[in-house]
Amino acid sequence: MDSLATDPAFIDSDVYLRLGLIIEGKRLKKPPTVLSRLSSSLERSLLLNHDDKILLGSPDSVTVFDGRSPPEISIAHYLDRIFKYSCCSPSCFVIAHIYIDHFLHKTRALLKPLNVHRLIITTVMLAAKVFDDRYFNNAYYARVGGVTTRELNRLEMELLFTLDFKLQVDPQTFHTHCCQLEKQNRDGFQIEWPIKEACRANKETWQKRTPDSLCSQTTAR
């Protein structure tokens, strides 16, 4: 993944360093900043979509990524878990953000508590497969993400066909999304999203629940 984060035509070392995309040494001692920035971006989208749907009656599409109920784990904890156990490069989370944007644009679906977790695990997995030198099989990612292998296989195929198998990301697009993520929370914006009360998760929760039960079954078939 170094090719995108270090492209000489678009490199902004300050932005990449602040996001934790340029790694000094073999292993990060703590989660990169890009995780918190991505979490803030997704949470903000959830809040804005929620307000638009109530005030404007914005239309929404149901996809196979929609579950019956929101998972109990927060987006921030979910991203940390995926990073910890998937061992993917930090840049994969920027790529995942790009894939999510493209998917929502093509399907005209809204990002919401019912689909955000499945979109995250599926897009991060695909990003690792495309851009990382090493990655795990679908069964492993399914266990990390709290879904069944069968469901993750189905989500992967849905995402691939929706994106027309166009998974390559040019350096300019990558750089633009990095800048967008880096600006998150600069204005002191604080997420006040009610789902957080139901989505708080800690280590004890993960230990007590089986991974396949962390995400509820999907609604769309």
From Swiss-Prot:
A single MF term (Gene Ontology): protein kinase binding
Tissue note: Expressed in roots, stems and flowers. Expressed in the shoot apex, leaf primordia and young leaves.
Any GO BP: cell division
Keyword terms, alphabetized: Cell cycle, Cell division, Cyclin
Keyword Glycoprotein attached: no
Keyword Cell cycle: yes
Domain of life (superkingdom): Eukaryota
One Pfam family it belongs to: Cyclin
Signal peptide stretch: none
InterPro entries documented for this protein: Cyclin-like_sf (IPR036915), Cyclin_P/U (IPR012389), Cyclin_PHO80-like (IPR013922)
SUPFAM superfamilies membership: Cyclin-like (SSF47954)
Family: Belongs to the cyclin family. Cyclin U/P subfamily.
Assembly and oligomerization: Interacts with CDKA-1 and CDKB1-1.
PANTHER family, per database record: PROTEIN CNPPD1, PTHR15615
Protein known as: Cyclin-U3-1
Species for this entry: Arabidopsis thaliana
